[in-house]
Amino acid sequence: MRVRKRKGAQEYLENNPHYVILEPEAAKGRWCEVFGNDHPIHIEVGSGKGAFITGMALKNPEINYIGIDIQLSVLSYALDKVLASQAPNIRLLRVDGSSLTNYFDAGEIDMMYLNFSDPWPKSRHEKRRLTYKSFLDTYKQILPENGEIHFKTDNRGLFEYSLASFSQYGMTLKQVWLDLHASDYPDNVMTEYEARFAKKGQVIYRLEATF
């Protein structure tokens, strides 16, 4: 879903350099210095308006979180939530998910979240899907051995594609949920999309996979 362009979004991000890392290339290999501790670092690629990343940071203060989104206005709405939360363990990046190795060293990230990514349903756009093999190559470089990806979507086609993509890549599927909200999974933190879909009774799919 497209988000309306937000006036002043660029200046808003630039005026909050504590939370929005404006030169992430300079932080490569030294994210522990950015956060001021050596806690594990989890990233969400495609963080949207920030409900998930903020909720996770408040729930798990012993983990550092980085929300990543390429859309300027979207990231500005995420900043709203981060500022309101005052959580010290969140940072935001406006970068593309295909270029993560420019900003993170090998094994520097402990876990990744992909939530409600664009399904890019047309076959000619397969390479744009965040679970396509070239993206998995990138993720593998910044995660440790046996690093985890947690993935959620309402799109069955993308879910089935991702199951196959992870398996073909040689990843291990730890757990799979075919109807997350009907399960007894206790630790779910919802995104904005997910909360909207849940009200409509839509099925949410989830999986956890390791390299």
From Swiss-Prot:
It holds the Pfam family Methyltransf_4. Substrate binds at residues 122, 154, 191-194. S-adenosyl-L-methionine binds at residues 44, 69, 96, 118. It catalyses: guanosine(46) in tRNA + S-adenosyl-L-methionine = N(7)-methylguanosine(46) in tRNA + S-adenosyl-L-homocysteine. Keywords: Methyltransferase, S-adenosyl-L-methionine, Transferase, tRNA processing. GO terms for cellular component: tRNA methyltransferase complex. GO terms for molecular function: tRNA (guanine(46)-N7)-methyltransferase activity. It comes from the Bacteria. Its EC number is 2.1.1.33. Pathway: tRNA modification; N(7)-methylguanine-tRNA biosynthesis. Signal peptide: none annotated. SUPFAM superfamilies: S-adenosyl-L-methionine-dependent methyltransferases (SSF53335). The active site is at residue 118. PROSITE patterns: SAM_MT_TRMB. Catalyzes the formation of N(7)-methylguanine at position 46 (m7G46) in tRNA. HAMAP family: tRNA_methyltr_TrmB. Belongs to the class I-like SAM-binding methyltransferase superfamily. TrmB family. This is tRNA (guanine-N(7)-)-methyltransferase. It comes from Streptococcus equi subsp. zooepidemicus (strain MGCS10565). The lineage of its organism: Bacteria, Bacillati, Bacillota, Bacilli, Lactobacillales.
